[in-house]
Amino acid sequence: MTKESKDMDCYLRRLKQELMSMKEVGDGLQDQMNCMMGALQELKLLQVQTALEQLEISGGTPTFSCPESSQEQPECPRWQGSGGPAGPAAWTSSSQPSFDSSPKLPCRRSVCGKELAVLPKTQLPEEHQSCTQQGTEWVEPDDWTSTLMSRGRNRQPLVLGDNVFADLVGNWLDLPELEKGGEKGETGGSIEPKGEKGQSRELGRKFALTANIFRKFLRSVRPDRDRLLKEKPGWMTPMVSESRAGRSKKVKKRSLSKGSGRFPFSSTGEPRHIETPATSSPKALEPSCRGFDINTAVWV
């Protein structure tokens, strides 16, 4: 029991010593952390002071430094005159500081000159940055994707519906043709070797011709409804009559195949009902055509 108690006492002493050492280490760490925080705060203050000094230098401190030198100039003779009695010693003492004070003026003037010389150096990078920013702003709108998205449709953005190909072709037809001249001028103005100039020009002309032909063909397929209504008021009647005739034929085939009792009339009476819309006058069909438009069904 005595040995165990002695061992326990030794362990407890060691633990106490370790705890004391840990406390000392913790105090040292706290002191170090406090020192580090103080150093960081001092660095922040120095950064703020340097920024303020730079602002003062760029703002206009030379106007304040030069008057200080002019104010300090008359202080020397006043102090010299009030210092000692009138005599040759006083004159000599007054003459010596006057010579000493004279070189101070050009030094301060030189300081003012340095500050004045620093101003354009600090202002030049800002002007250069503004010029570069303006240059980037002028370069960005030349992107062909932005022009396509902005000029492809005047009223709506480029939205692809179910008929994607028709939508894209319609947007291509709506594009202005004036941009082609600028693009041709840009491609012609680019520097190319002599052997490839003729080939590139021929390819460009062929592509332009095919594009113009394709565009004219598509525009002829997609007519302007308002213009055609003014020139030919009844231009939509034959297409509508054909569509109606086709629908009536389909209805007739279905009725004959199914044999349903929907049409109680005899077979002799059916063609009468079918022939009436085909032989009807265009005036009777015009009010019914107003609700349906072929252009809206094909072109988005």
Swiss-Prot record:
Alphabetically ordered keywords of this record: Nucleus
Region Disordered: start-end pairs: 59-104, 178-201, 230-288
Entry coiled-coil feature ranges: none
Role according to the record: Inhibitor of the serine/threonine-protein kinase PAK4. Acts by binding PAK4 in a substrate-like manner, inhibiting the protein kinase activity.
Region listing for Inka box, in residue ranges: 140-183
Protein name, per record: PAK4-inhibitor INKA2
Organism per entry: Mus musculus (Mouse)
Subunit structure: Interacts with PAK4.
GO CC annotations, alphabetized: nucleolus; nucleoplasm; nucleus
Location(s), subcellular: Nucleus
